[in-house]
A protein has these predicted regions:
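An active-site-proximal "capping" alpha-helix that borders the catalytic cofactor pocket
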Residues: 35-49
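C-terminal substrate/ligand-recognition segments
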Residues: 96, 154-166
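Long, amphipathic alpha-helical stalk/connector segments used for oligomerization, subunit docking
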Residues: 49-153
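Active-site recognition of the HExxH zinc-binding catalytic motif
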Residues: 1-22, 39-43
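Short alpha-helical patches at coil-to-helix transitions and adjacent helical residues
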Residues: 5, 35-39, 100, 104, ...
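Buried hydrophobic packing segments
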Residues: 15, 42-46, 107-110, 165
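Conserved binding/catalytic microenvironments
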Residues: 1-3, 25-32
Length: 166
């Protein structure tokens, strides 16, 4: 995990699973509704709760206890709401995050429709990154189209679910 937001996101996944009805756990209706629902809940917790000053007023004393150092709420909040273009989707702020998802969705559509060949993906990725975020990745493969686990693992069509809770 690279930052507290990642922990808060995964807490959202856990809270969703934890609060499914246990008394009917053996029935399909009591199971998770799929990854779209999972992502909506995790991103809701991250983006709506985890960026709220009231959450950090509550959580900060617990964080301080485990880190063993004092952290100021006034010093922390600007970092939580900082907006800056970046190459990595999972590290993106609340303004640019949807652009990362849209970029991936559009590239997936091109690959699935046959208008974009896989061999042309690095250049197409770079063009979209420059158009949407003003950043180039053409000479930086680790921040290019394989930075997420989805496509190398064959998971296409997943990225739009990341916008449901944002």
């Amino acid at each position: 995990y690279t930052d507290p937001a990642t922990s808060v996101t995964h807490t959202g996944h856990g809270l969703y699973e934890q609060n499914l009805p246990q008394e009917t756990a053996h029935w399909p209706s009591a199971r998770a509704r799929g990854m779209a629902m999972h992502e909506s809940q995790s991103l809701f917790v991250e983006k709506q709760i985890g960026r709220n000053p009231a959450f950090w007023a509550f959580a900060l004393p617990h964080v301080e206890k485990h880190l063993g150092e004092h952290l100021s709420l006034d010093a922390l909040l600007p970092h939580i709401h900082h907006v800056e273009r970046g190459l990595i989707r999972v590290d993106a702020d609340e303004v640019t995050y949807p652009l990362h998802v849209i970029l991936r969705y559009e590239l997936e559509q091109g690959m699935l429709s046959g208008t974009l060949q896989v061999r042309d993906l690095p250049e197409a990725w770079d063009a979209k990154m420059r158009d949407y975020l003003g950043l180039s990745t053409i000479h930086d493969p680790k921040n290019g189209p394989m930075q997420d686990v989805h496509w190398p693992g064959g998971a296409f069509g997943y990225f739009p679910s990341y916008t449901l809770g944002a």
